[in-house]
Amino acid sequence: MDETAREPVLVDLALQGGGSHGAFTWGVLDRLIEEPWLKIEAISGTSAGAMNAALVADGWTQGGAEGARAALEAYWRRVSQAAAFSPLQRSPLDRMMGRWTLDTSPAYIAMDLMARVVSPYDLNPLGLNPLRAVLAESIDFERLARAPIRLFITATSVRTGRGRIFRNKEITADVLLASACLPTMFHAVEIDGEPFWDGGYAGNPTLTPLVRESARVTPFWCKSIRANGWSRRARQARSSIGSTRFPSTRR
């Protein structure tokens, strides 16, 4: 059957947070967008999923499906290039063994311990975040405001613990940074005088607007639902706890 002649299928996408999940989701989205019959109506995203959502919508507005694919690739390559200068690198042994983990990286272990006792306001008093420059280079927020793909980006209010959903015209670099703001690593991001943390604490991702406003579409939920497993090691145990607690999809 000629795929170009196939009847279009409207879909909503729900994209979870987590840096590595976000990179994986890039590959999933790249493959989905290749299909000419698939039409994206709306995307709900949190944290890294919020970045992917904004990239798809902005890229699509500029150049259709190929524009969305190009925007995703350009962003993740910029992130990768920026990470090349980070002190958080795999240990020589991990490189030799072909393991993609930071669990034995001295810099990562030191940062992990430091983050438990020292506030990011002390470690990084200026609140610098290299991701801000990457976002500014990757997304045209004025164009995003008029994108045909509707966006629902979640961030968590520090004061109330409730999620706030931002739509296309409200989305700025601050909104995306707020959606990905881990409180042990970054300053809370203020929006309209209100401090926000990572959206994953309230909805990872939020499904409510997709269900209420897009009744005729097929939902496509891209998130990890498999825990890391049971371990006797402290760091892996904390990771498992986070994997169990953080995917708090709000329906």
Language-model-derived ranges and their functions:
Residues 45, 49:
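Gly/Ala-rich beta-loop-alpha elbow adjacent to hydrolase catalytic centers
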Residues 1-44, 54-251:
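Patatin-like phospholipase
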